[in-house]
Amino acid sequence: MMQRISLLLVLATLTACAQDDDALLEEVRDTLPAASEVRLDVPSTDNKSTLGAVAEFYQHTRNTSDFLNAASVVWVGLIQTIMRYPATSVEGDTITWGPWNDDSALRPFAYKLVAVRTGDRSITYSLSGKRRADAGDFIPLIEGAAERPDAGERGKGTLTLLFDNQAVIDVAKRERGSIAIRYDLTGEPRTNAVTFSDFVNERGEGPRDSEYGYLQRADGSGRFDFLTLANVDEDAAGQAENLHIVSNWDATGAGRSDVAAWGGNLGEVIWNVAQCWDASFLATFTSYAATGGAQPLLANEGDAASCAVSGETVAPLL
């Protein structure tokens, strides 16, 4: 009789442990970010017909958001893919997946994902990797922390992309430095902040530090404040200029960019540009002002009354 009771107690304990493991696994899967939570949703021309040239500074806004999305969404998607597989081990509050192999013959990498519960619906996680042929240790590629108030609700958190380490396992990677992303979808509006540290892009430009701020309201309107490089003066073969761009748009996608441009071929001159676009992303108004040169410049194209949103004062980040 005692032997039977002991066996039942063992089975009950094993069942409880399995249930705890399943609950932790479900909590981690639910808490870590989905790609949609880190993506910057700038209005798109994808589903609209555009007859004419797309507004230049709308295009800079879209290109920058596309770059940031490419840098983060792919990696978040990889984490979500790994978590669809059974966990390799569960020890206390720690879950490990891996080593997990990328199935593509052209990407011979192995990954390991470790997630640790640090509080009620609070998770820290690290995705590490190495080349499958190497005998060395896994090195961190992404580190993050995530919170979600309740299952199914919108969350918040941070994740950092470590490009120096990514280049160690993938020699084709040309980016260096790090990108840290802070996202918060728990309030209105949703916000994303992105910090570049010692970042070198795929063209070898950098290293540089910069901050990006994004918000999106429930109706689809939003704001994106960012720094980029582009050749905007008349010398097509010249150096790229620094652009500080603040873009705002309404629920239809119509919007306005306020821009400060400096450096490159501009020398001591600072340009301030305001450009408005309609719901098809075609420019409806552009104003140019240049200061610091021998002759100040002020010119307007189009109708200022066509601007769907108000402008902001934007200064160069000298």
Show where each model-derived region lies.
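Sec-dependent bacterial lipoprotein signal peptides
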Residues: 1-15
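N-terminal "mature head" segments of proteins
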Residues: 17-121, 288-318
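Intrinsically disordered, low-complexity regions enriched in Ser/Pro/Gly/Gln/His and often acidic
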Residues: 68, 88-90, 242, 255, ...
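Short N-terminal edge-element motif at the start of the domain
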Residues: 78-176
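Hydrophobic residues embedded in beta-strands of well-ordered beta-sheets
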Residues: 95, 122-125, 157, 190-192, ...
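Short acidic, glycine-rich loop/turn motifs
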Residues: 99-104, 129-133, 165, 198-203, ...
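Short helix-loop boundary/capping segments
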Residues: 141-250
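Hydrophilic extracytoplasmic domains
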Residues: 252-318
